[in-house]
Amino acid sequence: MGECDQILENDLWQGYKDQGFVVTQFSDLIERVLKWARSGSLWPMTFGLACCAVEMMHTAASRYDLDRYGIMFRASPRQADVMIVAGTLTNKMAPALRRVYDQMADPKYVISMGSCANGGGYYHYSYSVVRGCDRVVPVDIYVPGCPPTAEALLYGLLCLQQKILRNGQGTWRA
């Protein structure tokens, strides 16, 4: 039995439990608060490479009001914690994608938007196309479509929020 468990078994804490208060370990509480805060304030950075970027801009417009979900687009990778890769990733652009990903602060998440970013799309058999951005950076959410609608990207962002709330494990990457 650890020190924290001994404190929680104390008669003083038992009185709080009897009155209906939730008594938990401090580390569990901190972890819950961090998950809630991370999921409620996603700051995506756009990495638009092709026509999917137009739909990404459409999602950021006032019709969908991403601010109510705590989602605010940032231009700098140092201020963002989510990168949305939208469009065809070429071999020449892959090192730049990795460099931008490395500049993001931890924890960082990646959303792959559209068929081209997911697996090469229409240009899959071209010699100069990377067959999925997951070969360069780890991807958390895949949004299918060519191009995916603004609603599909919004659903992907909400799925990322749920993923962060469900499990905080695996969100810190090197």
From Swiss-Prot:
The keyword Hydrolase does not apply. Keywords: 4Fe-4S, Cell inner membrane, Cell membrane, Iron, Iron-sulfur, Membrane, Metal-binding, NAD, Quinone, Translocase, Transport, Ubiquinone. SUPFAM superfamilies: HydA/Nqo6-like. InterPro entries: NADH_UbQ_OxRdtase-like_20kDa, NADH_UQ_OxRdtase_20Kd_su. Gene3D superfamilies: 3.40.50.12280. It is a peripheral membrane protein. Its EC number is 7.1.1.-. It is found in: Cell inner membrane. It catalyses: a quinone + NADH + 5 H(+)(in) = a quinol + NAD(+) + 4 H(+)(out). Belongs to the complex I 20 kDa subunit family. NCBIfam families: nuoB_fam (TIGR01957), PRK06411.1 (NF005012). This is NADH-quinone oxidoreductase subunit B. It comes from Anaplasma phagocytophilum (strain HZ). The gene is nuoB.
